[in-house]
Structure formats: C-alpha cells, structure tokens
C-alpha cells in the first residue's frame, strides 16, 4: 500500500507540474485565452486515460502501483474539473456567453471523444 501511495504522489506531482507549466505558458503567451490551458490539459488527459485504460485491459498483470500512479496520480494531477468550472464562470461573468457555452461543450464532448480515441488506439 505504501508503494501505491508513493507512486500516486510522485506521478501526481508530475501531472500537477505539467498542468501548472501549461497554464503559465498560455497566460504568458495568450492571456486573453486563459481557458485554453485548462481545455488542453483536460482533453489531453482524457486521451491519456483512454490509452491507459485500454492498455491495462490488455495487460491486467500491470502492477497496481503503476496503474494507480499513472491514472490517479499523473492524469488526476494533470486534469482539473474545478478549473474548467471557474473558467466557464469567468467567461459567463464577462458576458461571453457563446464562448462559455462553446468551451463547456467542447470540454465535455471533446473529453469524451478523446477518451474514446485513446481507448480505440489500444485496440488497433
């Protein structure tokens, strides 16, 4: 159990740092499009979780430390529903209703599509 906790913690740090770096880069280069970082990490995270899920279905012998570390730790640290919610609220509060609705729709449906695509890649 300790090894699983360590794997989740270490991978979570990596995912969180990648999300932070993505947000910092987008803020520095495209401050008007602050929501793009959250959208990007969430869609990429969905793709990654689809691939990992598919791989782990094919390889059930992969140790729990690796499975939990990658899915719960790395992908959990990388993706964020709370930032998505805040970004959407900020867009709504600034009167950008069509953009907020588009962002929410792309986030949800794009995430589902990316997860499906990731899983499908493991079935080729």
UniProtKB/Swiss-Prot annotation:
Keywords: Cell inner membrane, Cell membrane, Ion channel, Ion transport, Membrane, Metal-binding, Sodium, Transmembrane, Transmembrane helix, Transport. Pfam families: CRCB. It is found in: Cell inner membrane. The chain crosses the membrane at residues 5-25, 38-58, 69-89, 99-119. One of its GO terms (molecular function) is fluoride channel activity. Na(+) binds at residues 76, 79. GO terms for cellular component: plasma membrane. InterPro entries: FluC. Its main location: membrane. It is a multi-pass membrane protein. GO terms for biological process: cellular detoxification of fluoride. It catalyses: fluoride(in) = fluoride(out). Na(+) is not transported, but it plays an essential structural role and its presence is essential for fluoride channel function. Belongs to the fluoride channel Fluc/FEX (TC 1.A.43) family. Fluoride-specific ion channel. Important for reducing fluoride concentration in the cell, thus reducing its toxicity. This is Fluoride-specific ion channel FluC. It comes from Pseudomonas syringae pv. syringae (strain B728a). The lineage of its organism: Bacteria, Pseudomonadati, Pseudomonadota, Gammaproteobacteria, Pseudomonadales.
């Amino acid at each position: 159990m300790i090894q699983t906790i360590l794997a989740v913690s270490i991978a979570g740090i990596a995912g969180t740092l990648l999300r932070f770096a993505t947000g910092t880069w987008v803020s520095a280069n495209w401050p008007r499009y602050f929501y793009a970082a959250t959208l990007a990490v969430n869609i990429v995270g969905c793709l990654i979780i689809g691939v990992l899920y598919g791989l782990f279905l094919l390889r059930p012998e992969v140790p729990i430390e690796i499975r939990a570390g990658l899915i719960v730790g790395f992908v959990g640290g990388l993706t964020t529903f709370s930032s998505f919610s805040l970004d959407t609220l900020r867009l709504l509060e600034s009167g950008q209703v069509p953009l907020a609705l588009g962002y929410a729709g792309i986030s949800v449906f794009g995430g589902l599509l990316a997860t499906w695509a990731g899983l499908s890649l493991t079935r080729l």
